[in-house]
Swiss-Prot record:
GO molecular function: ribose-5-phosphate isomerase activity
Top-level taxon: Eukaryota
Biological processes annotated in GO: D-ribose metabolic process; pentose-phosphate shunt, non-oxidative branch
Full protein name: Ribose-5-phosphate isomerase
Main location per the UniProt record: cytoplasm
Record field: catalytic activity: aldehydo-D-ribose 5-phosphate = D-ribulose 5-phosphate
InterPro entries referenced in this protein's UniProt entry, alphabetically: NagB/RpiA_transferase-like, Ribose5P_isomerase_type_A
Organism annotation: Mycosarcoma maydis (Corn smut fungus)
EC id: 5.3.1.6
Length: 286
């Protein structure tokens, strides 16, 4: 028994040394301002929520998420070899593959330990608007499948009420043959400026990864004050597949500030501002 314990201890120490060496050999790019803070926010979120025992991890999209994958990769092959990583869309799929991590899908892993994703806006209750990249159907599936859903973003996404910073409207994924009727019904609900989202590098509408269309529907401030109610009302419209309002799902949110610090909010109402995180320290591997 003593010999077995010694062998296990040696193996654990060897794995820890391998992970530490992998981290030390990786050169961190020099960043400044909000970009440095976005990296710090992502690293802190990974260190606090992606534990070595977690085996199924959801990876979302957004400009802060690449730093999430970067930090996870720094945890080393000994930790990541047993893990599966489930993407919300093309961007996160490519991040997972390029980092040499194992690619999974939600069909195989309908229960996820933790999902980390970006957001277009987050209010004080951690309700989110998502879907600026037209991935919100898959993003919500992974968010709801996770035991813990965490958001990482920059300070421009940190608001007091939804619709005050993200002005493009609520993203709504719709069946292509139903978009005209959904637009009509949204306007009757109060979204006078609801529009079908058009492609920027192609003629015609944006087509989601699921082959559907996306509508952007701005609503008056009075309706945005109760995003849960608005979500339910939009979801009842025939032809609507998913709504980019994520209500009562997010547990924690990490924001990179323009001064290099991070702000951490929790669904319980706790707020930490001006947090400094040392990105040069090695992540936990045991």
């Amino acid at each position: 028994m003593a010999s077995s314990n010694a062998t296990n201890s040696t193996s654990a120490a060897s794995a820890a040394n391998t992970n530490s060496s992998a981290f030390k050999s990786a050169e961190l790019a020099a960043l400044s301002g909000v970009e440095a803070a976005k990296r710090a926010a992502a690293y802190a979120a990974v260190d606090n929520h992606v534990k070595p025992q977690h085996e199924i991890i959801g990876i979302g999209s957004g400009s802060t998420v690449p730093y999430v994958v970067e930090r996870i990769a720094q945890q080393g092959p000994a930790v990541n070899a047993k893990r599966w990583f489930v993407p919300t869309g093309f961007q996160s799929r490519e991040l997972i593959i390029n980092a040499g991590l194992r690619l999974g899908d939600v069909d195989s892993f309908p229960s996820i330990d933790v999902t980390i994703d970006g957001a277009d806006e987050v209010d004080n209750a951690l309700n989110c608007i998502k879907g600026g990249g037209a991935c919100h159907l898959r993003e919500k599936v992974l968010a709801e499948a996770a035991n813990e859903f965490v958001v990482v973003a920059d300070y421009r996404k940190n608001g007091s009420q939804l619709g005050t910073k993200w002005l493009q409207g609520v993203p709504i994924e719709v069946a292509p043959f139903a978009y005209a009727k959904v637009l009509q019904n949204l306007k009757k609900m109060g979204s006078d400026k609801a529009v079908l989202r058009m492609g920027k590098a192609k003629a015609g509408p944006v087509v989601t990864d699921n082959g559907n269309f996306c509508i952007d529907a701005p609503f008056p401030e009075a309706q945005m004050k109760d995003p849960s109610d608005l979500l339910k009302r939009i979801k009842l419209l025939t032809g609507v597949l998913e709504v980019g309002l994520f209500c009562n799902i997010c547990k924690s949110a990490y924001f990179g500030n323009d001064d290099g610090t991070i702000t951490i909010k929790t669904a319980a109402g706790d707020v930490q501002e001006g947090v400094h995180f040392d990105v040069s320290k090695a992540p936990a591997t045991a």
